[in-house]
Structure formats: C-alpha cells, structure tokens
Amino acid sequence: MSDTKRWDGPPVETWSMAWTPDQAAEALEGVAAPWAVAGGWALDLWLGKQTRKHEDLEITVPRAFFPEIQARLEGLGLQLFAVDDGQAIALEPGEAPGRRGFQTWAMEPAVNGWRMDVFSEPGDAQTWIYRRTGELSAPRAWASGRTPAGIPYVAPQIVLLFKAKATRDKDQVDFALIAPKLLPEARDWLAAALRIIQPGHLWIDQLSA
C-alpha cells in the first residue's frame, strides 16, 4: 500500500497570500451564515489592533451553513479543497467535503495562492459546541463578537481554549496578552473548561490567580 499523500493545491507557502479579515468580510458580505474569524486574527479583532503577523486566515461556521460559504467563495471564482491528514483534495463545485475532515481551504486560481481556511463546526446559529470533544457548549452570542465595522469573530476565551492544546510559542504570547484583559466571567469559564478537557494545564493556575 502506498503512503503517498495527495496534494492537489498550491504549496503551503502560498498562505502568504491569505486574505485579511477585512477582505474576508467583503467577500462574504450578505451571506447569512453565522461565520466568524477564528485564531490569532480573532484576538486582534477583539483587541482592536493587529499585534503580530498572521500565517493564514481562519473562519469558522456551523457545519449546516457551510454550503452558503462554499457557494459564495466558488461564486467568486475560488477553488475549495478538503484538507485532512496531510492531504489537500480538490472539490468539485458544490461538492461536500464529506468525511474528509473539518477543514476546507479556499484557493484563488488567478494567483495560485490560499486565501482562507474554513472550519466546519458542530452547533447551530444559536449554540456553539466545542468541536474536539463536544463536551462544552455556550450560547453563540456569548462565544462570538463583532468589531465596530461589523466583522464577526470568535470570542477570546474560545480562541484560547483551542490554543491551549499545543501551546506553541505564539499561543503562549497570545495568552499572556489576552488573559489579563478577559472579563472575570470569561476567565472563570476558560479555567473551568480547561479543567474538563486538559486537567493540569499550566494556564489554569494563571487564570485563577
């Protein structure tokens, strides 16, 4: 059996062409799906300023609403790829990613570069559900926010919850910057969530201090 991985898209290095949140919001203007910017960009949107360079642009959307995002991006001429287990498999227009994982990368053929990483999540328009285990949930209105310009983003306590898994250098920097600024309710929630999914995580004591 061959161990060759299938990679239909451009090199990963072309994520240097990723859209900014402003560009993503312009592309998705009028789409009713409850999407939101995720990852490090979401923290910067919450802060109201860019604090560091970002390697890509991630958005999240409940799985049931993914076809709306797909239709808009394909309508703009982008090609979508199901990405999982080191593979990037090109999707036909309107083709669902199926069981190929939760990540779909959007590439613009005109520049042969990646523009956006779309996470298909559980939950619905009213409820956010933690994708990795399903053990945690919260009202979507509490788990997200909007900039003054109307760009939706994942709330910082949710972003940090996902960043806690690997705790790369940039994740630790983000935590040190964001955690002291969280409201008490958000800090307490994040600490409690970590006790459930990652007991003993070094951030728990820092959040409780």
Residues of each region from the PLM?
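Compositionally biased terminal segments of proteins
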Residues: M1-A209
